[in-house]
């Protein structure tokens, strides 16, 4: 099975209010050292008593809560398509990242020796400092090795330069492809307008030709960027071949990871992945805007994530199709959340999440606020949709 998410040593601590300014900061450890892999098409269930951190983990995975430590790698997209800023930053400052790793290891060893020397006299805070130092060293290793690989220990400056050149071309190709897709979407919308309003057909045709000319220009640039990426990969492969028999190089090369580290993404970058990673909240009513109709609630995500332009004639039939999949009738399109029962509201939440065609959905106890009589219906709905859509 193909891996979709890989969580390693994930921690989420919530700070507790200090009793005084000089008091040591204490934390509630909601999630502690969680490591697991989630595979495509899999259904993973988390079982635990109330308050044990199930909902927190789901929200941390989606970066709705910022994780304290650990890594969350997402494999639904490649680094080339997401083009995260942290990759370029790591490569531009490769020697600094390697230096930070060595400093973190030295500090962790120093704290471990200090704690061992104290023996039974070691306090909770001594042990906590030791564990945090070890965690910092692991994080520093992850930050450097997942991007640099073997070049972390051999010829760092040259290797980072070659990797930087390769990623720059790949990121440019991804950016150009995104622009091409946007122009195609504009053309699709204009074709719909021309079809529905014949009077505007001539004006739309002129705009379509303009967009098509831009697409042709961008496609030529995209081909050049792809060719440059392939050439950079050949140079990189030749450089790596020099260290084929070096065990130290191969050890760090094995740590290379082409997944996207969700923890290191900036807000705008994470927003691009929101359509891939969705959540169905526990209480349907509090997660719906009471001032928006069902149609507006479902359309909001489609417009935000550029599936359709606002006002597109083709969006409404798609919304109807999504509603029907989730057991909602077309006449409910203009109704407000307060006009529905609890089970129907949860169907709206499910429709809102699935409309953007996600790859991974967190169901945060999505039936616990519902009557027992309709819980089975709502449980079976995501199960049926999972089989049809290949959800995780």
Model-predicted segments: where are they?
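Conserved ABC transporter NBD signature motif
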Residues: 70-81, 164-167, 245-261
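A short, proline-enriched helix->beta-strand linker immediately N-terminal to the Walker B motif
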Residues: 355-359, 375, 388
């Amino acid at each position: 099975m193909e891996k979709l998410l890989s969580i390693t040593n994930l921690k989420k601590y919530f700070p507790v209010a200090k009793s005084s300014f000089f008091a040591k900061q204490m934390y509630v450890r909601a999630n502690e050292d969680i490591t697991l892999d989630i595979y495509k098409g899999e259904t993973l269930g988390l079982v635990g008593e109330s308050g044990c951190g199930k909902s927190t983990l789901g929200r941390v995975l989606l970066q709705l809560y910022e994780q304290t430590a650990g890594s969350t790698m997402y494999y639904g997209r490649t680094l080339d398509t997401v083009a995260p800023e942290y990759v370029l930053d790591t490569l531009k400052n490769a020697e600094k990242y390697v230096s930070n790793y060595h400093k973190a290891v030295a500090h962790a060893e120093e704290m471990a020796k200090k704690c061992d020397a104290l023996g039974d006299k070691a306090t909770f805070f001594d042990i906590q400092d030791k564990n945090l130092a070890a965690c910092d060293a692991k994080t520093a290793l992850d930050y450097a090795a997942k991007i640099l690989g073997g070049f972390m220990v051999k010829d760092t400056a040259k290797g980072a330069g070659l990797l930087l050149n390769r990623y720059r071309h790949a990121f440019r190709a991804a950016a150009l492809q995104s622009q091409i897709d946007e122009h195609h979407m504009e053309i699709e919308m204009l074709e719909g307008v021309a079809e529905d309003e014949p009077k505007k057909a001539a004006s739309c045709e002129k705009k379509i030709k303009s967009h098509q000319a831009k697409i042709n220009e961008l496609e030529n640039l995209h081909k050049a960027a792809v060719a440059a990426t392939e050439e950079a990969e050949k140079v990189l492969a030749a450089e790596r071949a020099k260290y084929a028999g070096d065990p130290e190089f191969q050890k760090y090369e094995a740590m290379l990871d082409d997944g996207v580290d969700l923890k290191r993404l900036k807000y705008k970058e994470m927003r691009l992945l929101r359509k891939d990673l969705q959540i169905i909240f526990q209480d349907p009513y509090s997660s719906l805007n009471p001032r928006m109709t069902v149609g507006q609630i479902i359309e909001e995500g489609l417009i935000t994530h550029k599936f359709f332009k606002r006002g597109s004639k083709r969006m409404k039939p798609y919304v109807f199709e999504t509603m029907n999949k989730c057991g909602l009738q077309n006449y409910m399109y203009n109704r407000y959340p307060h006009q529905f029962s609890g089970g129907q509201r949860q169907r709206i939440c499910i429709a809102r999440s699935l409309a953007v065609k996600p790859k991974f959905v967190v169901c945060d106890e999505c039936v616990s606020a519902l009557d027992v009589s309709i819980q089975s219906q709502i449980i079976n709905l995501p199960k049926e949709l999972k089989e049809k859509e290949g959800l995780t």
